[in-house]
A protein has these predicted regions:
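Active-site acidic/histidine clusters and adjacent loop/turn architecture
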Residues: 36-103, 163-172, 177-180
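Extended, low-complexity, intrinsically disordered C-terminal regulatory tails
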Residues: 30-32, 83-115, 182-206
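Catalytic cores and adjacent binding grooves of peptidoglycan-active enzymes
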Residues: 25, 138, 142-286
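Cleaved targeting-peptide boundary
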Residues: 21-30
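Sec-dependent signal peptide recognition
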Residues: 3-11
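N-terminal signal peptide c-region/cleavage motif recognized by signal peptidases
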Residues: 16-18
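Short, surface-exposed glycine/acidic/tryptophan-bearing loops
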Residues: 115-133
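Envelope-exposed proteins and targeting segments
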Residues: 96-98, 122-126, 179, 213-217
Length: 286
């Protein structure tokens, strides 16, 4: 009888234990310090994938500096690196801007991160600081300690006095780039750009309101041509999206009452390697 009781208890403990003892994908990818020895390719989606053959954005270039170097997140698909070079060269032509300060792109082999982002996994996302660079010779220590500046007022309903026409121009140039799928920025900035744009408004479709994103804006590139393992996000709805941004602002200023029937949010499960595209196992090993 006692033996049966002990066996039953052991079975119960095993059933209660985690279904898998596999290490988390974020631990595996977060441990890699260099890119894989493969042809450059994004595998999977922006929030569930990896990056083969990633290219490292140089820490300093003619018109940019990569920030927070200790994170080792200045890796991306070569097309992303080229985009940064191009946009920063444009930014350097704006009054008061020496170029761009670049935040997180991806880890050396992409994949889930130990801290921070859910996306930025396939080398096609890049955070660009709102702070206008005055110089591009910051030391490594300065790049760890300096902070960007917030552009928002009233919890993101409006831009503040630090927002300039130069910010508008840089985001517009990014949105007009054919490589770009969408750009995330706080709602008040989108509404302000809608008010200020007097020309062709087609590019505004790519400017998407989202929570946060007032110290930086987040550029997401489309899957490069020929990247068959890459999963694009659905395109933004047709139109300039300005009315939608105004609804975001209205909800910030006058928050709707909570839904009494809303279910509590389900905690997202942490990915293991088997959850990612099968090519990611190869990317980890090379």
């Amino acid at each position: 009888m006692m033996k049966q009781f002990v066996q039953a208890g052991l079975v119960a403990c095993l059933l209660a234990a985690p279904a898998s003892a596999e290490p988390l994908a974020k631990e595996l990818f977060g441990a890699k310090t260099t890119s894989s020895n493969e042809h450059a390719a994004p595998h999977g989606g922006y929030a569930k994938g990896c990056l083969a053959g990633g290219a490292q954005l140089p820490e300093t270039g003619p018109t940019w500096q990569a920030m927070r170097l200790s994170r080792n997140r200045n890796w991306g698909h070569p097309e992303t690196v080229d985009f940064i070079r191009d946009l920063s060269a444009y930014a350097a032509k704006q009054e008061g801007w020496a170029g761009l300060y670049i935040g997180d792109i991806s880890q050396p082999r992409g994949g889930p991160m130990l801290t921070g982002h859910r996306s930025h996994q396939i080398g096609l996302d890049v955070d660009i600081w709102m702070l206008a660079p005055k110089r591009l010779n910051l030391s490594r220590t300065e790049r760890e300690n300096i902070s960007s500046v917030s552009m928002r007022r009233a919890k993101g309903a409006y831009v503040n006095s630090k927002w300039t026409r130069q910010h508008h121009n840089i985001l517009k140039a990014a949105a007009r780039d054919k490589r770009v799928a969408r750009i995330f920025v706080f709602p008040g900035a989108k509404v302000q750009m809608c008010k200020d744009e007097k020309g062709n408004r087609a590019w505004l479709r790519k400017i998407r309101p989202w929570w946060g994103h007032h110290y930086h804006f987040h550029v997401r590139l489309a899957c490069p041509r020929g990247a068959n393992g890459c999963v694009d996000q659905a395109p933004p709805p047709k139109g300039d999206g300005c009315a939608d941004a105004e609804r975001w602002v209205a909800d910030i200023l006058n928050p709707p009452p909570p839904d009494p029937n809303a279910k509590p949010p389900v905690k997202r499960r942490e990915y293991v390697l088997a959850d990612l595209p099968k090519q990611c196992a190869t990317t980890l090993s090379r």
